[in-house]
Design a protein with these regions (language model features):
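HhH-family (HhH-GPD) DNA N-glycosylase catalytic core used in base-excision repair
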Residues: 1-133
Length: 133
């Protein structure tokens, strides 16, 4: 049974989302068709996509953003957390604020890891204290 702390593979996820009762328990609401389309599309990806063989971050981002409901931030999150592109930097409100207020730039190889620290720093208030807020 899915939901016991495991992450289903794309094929399993597509099957689970096709089950109305199971999908209702997830409470995905309007996001369900987007997730279902993404899982179905992931099935068609070449295995190299998941192994990152000869696939650049830009190629992965472009392909992900072609999926309904997936924009730059979500694509960056998938690339960083799901596909292991440590250079992917998801930009949300907190990160955009940090960029604007500090003029910071991101490490070419580990920007995604750097982003996680900056996100926590700004969101948890340390950034506010440093900014005099």
């Amino acid at each position: 049974e899915a939901g016991g702390g495991c992450v289903p593979k794309p094929g399993e996820l597509a099957g689970l989302l096709a089950d109305e009762a199971f999908a209702a328990r997830l409470k995905l609401g309007y996001r369900r068709p987007y997730l279902e389309a993404l899982a179905t599309r992931a099935l068609a990806w070449h295995p190299a996509r998941l192994d990152r063989e000869d696939v650049s971050l830009e190629e992965s981002m472009t392909e992900l953003e072609e999926c309904p409901g997936v924009g730059p931030k979500v694509a960056s999150c998938i690339c960083l957390f799901g596909l292991g592109y440590l250079e992917a930097v998801p930009r949300d409100t907190w990160i955009k604020r940090a960029e604007r207020e500090t003029g910071m730039s991101w490490d070419e190889r580990y920007g995604g890891i750097q982003q996680q620290y900056v996100f926590a720093w700004y969101r948890e208030g340390a950034g506010r204290h440093e900014r005099g807020v």
